[in-house]
Amino acid sequence: NEVLRRVGDDNNRPLLNVPDPRAEIERLLAVRREAYAAIPWQVDTTGLSVEEVAARVIEIAGVVTLPVRYPGGAPSGLAESTAGRPQGGQYEIYIGDRVLAHVGSLLRAAGAPEGSRVAVVSNPVVAPLYGAQVEAALRSAGFRPFACSIPDGEQHKTLTTVATLYEQFLAGGLDRSGTVLSLGGGVTGDVAGFAAATFMRGIRFVQVPTTLLAMVDASVGGKTGVDLPQGKNLVGAFKQPALVIIDPTVLATLPAEEIHSGLAEMIKHGVIAAPDLFAELEKGIRYSPFTTHHAPFAVRSSQIARALRVKIEIVEEDPFEQGLRAVLNLGHTVGHALEKLSDFALRHGEAVGIGMVAAARIAAELGRANPSLADRIEALLAAWGLPVGCPPFDADAIWEAMAYDKKRRGRSLLWVLPRAVGQVEIAEDVPPRVVRSVLCSMGARCEG
C-alpha cells in the first residue's frame, strides 16, 4: 500500500506497467527480501518528513562500529570433537545513541533467519523500560520475539536461574534457529549467555547491555557463567555473541551509583593499557555530571569505545584466558572476595575499585611500583564517588574467600599488579604477609 501510494500516477515505472501492480510489488519484494535483510542500517521513512529522515541518517552515521575477531576451537588442554569444534569468526559491536531501535535489522544482517524466535531475557527492572521497544524493533524486522524474565541481582546468578530460563525457552518455542538476546546488566548477560551456550548445545546469542559496567566489560569477550556458593563464575562457558548493541542513551535511567560502578571498569582499562583514557577521566572530575540521582548521557560513545578497544585487543590475542587476558582481572582477586563476603551488597565495580587500590599498594610494597601510583588511582576512584577503603571484614576471611578464586596456578594466587598507568604485570610470588599488611592498612579487621 505504501509503495503504491508513493508511486501515485507516475507512469514512468516500467516494472509496474502491468495489469496488477500490487501483485508485481509483492513479487519484487519477495525476490529482494534477502538482499534487503542483509543491509544492517535501515530507516523506515513512512510518515516522516525529509528533515526527520535526514536526522535519523545523521544519527546512524555517528554510530561507532568495532569488529571483534575470535578463533575457532577451545581452550588448550580441553578435549573437543572435530564435528563439535566451534568455528572462528567475527562479530560487531555497535555503539551509538538510539541504536536500540535498529536491533532487528542488525540481527537480520548478522544472519538470523526471518521468522525465527528471539528470547528477550531481561529482569523486572529493565524490561518495563526497554523490553517493548526491543520487541517492536525485532517484530518490524520479521522476528517472533517473546519475553523471558529472571530475577535481578548477583545472588540469582545460579544454575537454578539458568534452569528456569530453559523452561521459558521451551515454552516460547525456541529452537536451534532461534536467538537468545540479553537485555540488562552483567548478571543478565552472564546467565542468558550461559543458557544460550548450553540450550540445545548452543544457539545464537546477542548482547544488549543496559549498564555502563556491562557495556565496557561483561558484554564483550565471550565469557558467560554462574556462581557457586564457594565463589563467583566457577561454572561457565565461552560463548561469542553474534553482535553487541550499546546504546548510551539507556544510561539516562541508571542511578548515578551504577554509573560510578561502571566507571571503575573504565578506570581499570585505563590503568591496564589506556593512559589517555585514564587522563581524560581525571580531567572529567572538574565538570562531573554525576550530581543527581540520574546521569543522562554523561558517558560518551567515544569513551565507551576507547575502553572497549583495550579489552578487544587483549581478548583477540588470548580469547580463552590462557595468558595475557588475565591482565583484565586487575582488582578482581581482592574484589571478588569482598563481593562474596558482603553477600553482594558491594557492587562489582566498587569491589574492583578497592581491589585495584589493594593491587597498587601491594605492587608498591614489593618495590614494583611507585607509591604515588596507588595514590593516583585511589584519588581518581574517590573523585568519582567510589569507595577506596576495605570494608571491616576479617583479613583471614578475605584470604579464605580468595582461596576459591579461578585466577590460580596450582596453589598460587595470580595477581595483576600495576607498575604504571598503562602498564601491568602478572605475579604469583606475592607473600601472604604483604597481602595481609595491605588489607589491614586499608581497613580490614586484623588481630595479632
Regions inferred by a protein language model and the residue ranges of each:
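A glycine- and Lys/Arg-enriched "phosphate-lid" helix/loop adjacent to the NTP-binding pocket
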Residues: 1-33
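NTP-dependent small-molecule kinase module
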Residues: 30-70, 433
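A glycine/threonine-rich phosphate-anchoring loop and its flanking beta-alpha core
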Residues: 40, 194-284
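ATP/NTP phosphate-donor binding region
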Residues: 62-81, 87-179
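Intrinsic disorder/low-complexity segments
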Residues: 71-89, 286-301, 447
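Short glycine/serine/threonine-rich phosphate/pyrophosphate-binding segments
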Residues: 187-194, 215-216, 337
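C-terminal charged capping/lid subdomain of soluble metabolic enzymes
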Residues: 258, 264-267, 368-448
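Active-site segments that bind and position negatively charged phosphate/pyrophosphate groups
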Residues: 280, 284-287, 293-396
